[in-house]
């Protein structure tokens, strides 16, 4: 599977075209809208979320609630475009209209794509950069991820994300009895945190940052249960599943770090306290005593839950902006201010779910794939039976 997205933050719409989804997958707009609504929630979001109520339009590739095997086109309207029709319109402006427009950006924000992108593409108005580099684009990445999650769900695989740290406040209680319980607790939390006490402290940290004109980041974790053993590859570097997951997490706006399983903690332990001992029983076949590897060894799944964490830096748009330089005059100025969130970590956990789901669904279809969901399901069932008795 693959997809491409198009659209600017304040343009008329966001679009994604998805190729390679097997035929016979049950899919309706609600499946996608539910994920879009989750992305828009979360304590710390800005005023934009009060304007947009994201709803997807399925333009092609689905008929009567079932995928056809042909490309799927999804569109999400930007309601805020009504206020930006001249500024973001595709048609040329008159000289008078150009003078009247007040939205030209010449003061790049530290931490954003503004300056680097303007130099790369030769834009004197950095709005041409920030409109596309905005995290608004993750709307349609979540839409594509919703399709991938539907593929996984049909194959008995569950994806769940939660927040484990915001602004230096770390969740202490992160245990759960089942992945469904994890999902239930996090959906009820304004910051998508399993630890209620830590969640309240996270909310305070967000409030403090907002009152100071600042922003804060954090850490999200995605857990996946139900993956078969041996998905991915050790044969070539670019087919290693952990490498693909790491790249997917790092592709999310403002993410600066990723770890799998115990991650960097492995540097502090001897090998005897890192590697997961192998067990076997007649009912389940091969399992592990621990899951320090986070469900991945040698670029392949172990059959244990996949555990991936990502670090999100504070959003670079600050209401007390840092020093910058006007690219027209070269004089020092404070950076431009765009409407933004104080903290987008809870929402980012939903985006992280989406990109992880996409990589896993793609890997499964590559390994077991045919053009029909029923045949893929049969292939995985045969593989699981083979692995249990290996």
UniProtKB/Swiss-Prot annotation:
GO biological process: amino acid biosynthetic process; aromatic amino acid family biosynthetic process; chorismate biosynthetic process
CDD domains assigned: Chorismate_synthase
EC number, UniProt record: 4.2.3.5
Keyword field contains Lyase: yes
PROSITE patterns: CHORISMATE_SYNTHASE_1, CHORISMATE_SYNTHASE_2, CHORISMATE_SYNTHASE_3
GO molecular function terms noted in the UniProt entry: chorismate synthase activity; FMN binding
Single GO cellular component term: cytosol
UniProt remark on cofactor binding: Reduced FMN (FMNH(2)).
Pathway in which this enzyme or protein is active: Metabolic intermediate biosynthesis; chorismate biosynthesis; chorismate from D-erythrose 4-phosphate and phosphoenolpyruvate: step 7/7
Annotated binding of FMN, by residue: 132-134, 253-254, 298, 313-317, 339
Keyword NADP annotated: yes
Necessary cofactors: FMNH2
Binding site residues for NADP(+): 39, 45
Catalytic activity: 5-O-(1-carboxyvinyl)-3-phosphoshikimate = chorismate + phosphate
Keywords: Amino-acid biosynthesis, Aromatic amino acid biosynthesis, FAD, Flavoprotein, FMN, Lyase, NADP
PANTHER family assigned to the protein according to its UniProt record, in alphabetical order: CHORISMATE SYNTHASE
Quaternary structure (record): Homotetramer.
Protein family according to the UniProt entry: Belongs to the chorismate synthase family.
Function in brief: This reaction introduces a second double bond into the aromatic ring system.
Protein name: Chorismate synthase 1
Annotated organism of origin: Bacillus thuringiensis subsp. konkukian (strain 97-27)
């Amino acid at each position: 599977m693959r997809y491409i997205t198009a659209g600017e933050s304040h343009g008329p719409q966001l679009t994604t075209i998805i190729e390679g989804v097997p035929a016979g997958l049950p899919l309706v707009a609600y499946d996608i809208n539910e994920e879009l609504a989750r992305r828009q929630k979360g304590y710390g979001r800005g005023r934009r979320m009060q304007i947009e109520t994201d709803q997807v339009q399925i333009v092609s590739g689905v008929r009567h609630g079932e995928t056809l095997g042909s490309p799927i086109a999804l569109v999400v309207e930007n309601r805020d475009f009504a206020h930006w029709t001249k500024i973001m319109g595709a048609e040329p402006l008159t000289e008078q209209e150009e003078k009247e427009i007040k939205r030209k950006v010449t003061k790049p924000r530290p931490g954003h794509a503004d300056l680097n992108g303007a130099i790369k593409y030769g834009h004197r108005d950095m709005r041409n950069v920030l409109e596309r580099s905005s995290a608004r684009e993750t709307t349609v990445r979540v839409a594509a991820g919703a399709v991938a999650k539907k593929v996984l769900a049909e194959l008995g695989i569950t994806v769940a994300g939660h927040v484990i740290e915001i602004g230096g406040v770390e969740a202490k209680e992160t245990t759960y009895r089942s992945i469904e319980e994890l999902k239930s607790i996090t959906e009820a939390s304004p910051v998508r945190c399993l630890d209620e006490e830590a969640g309240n402290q996270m909310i305070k940290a967000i409030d403090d940052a907002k009152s100071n004109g600042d922003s804060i980041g954090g850490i999200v974790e995605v857990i996946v249960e139900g993956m078969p053993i041996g998905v991915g590859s050790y044969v070539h570097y670019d087919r290693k599943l952990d490498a693909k997951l790491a790249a997917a997490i790092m592709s999310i706006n403002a993410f600066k770090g990723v770890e799998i399983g115990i991650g960097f903690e492995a540097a502090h332990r001897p090998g005897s306290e890192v590697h997961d001992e192998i067990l076997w029983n007649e009912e389940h076949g091969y399992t592990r005593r621990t899951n320090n590897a986070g469900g991945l060894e040698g670029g392949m799944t172990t059959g244990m839950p996949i555990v991936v964490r990502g670090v999100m830096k504070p959003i670079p748009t600050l209401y007390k902006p840092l020093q910058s330089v006007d690219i027209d005059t070269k004089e020092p100025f404070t950076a431009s201010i765009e409407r933004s969130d104080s903290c987008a970590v809870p929402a980012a956990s939903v985006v992280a779910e989406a990109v992880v789901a996409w990589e896993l669904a793609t890997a499964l279809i590559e390994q077991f794939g045919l053009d029909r969901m029923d045949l893929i399901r049969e292939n995985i069932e045969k593989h699981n039976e083979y692995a249990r008795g290996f």
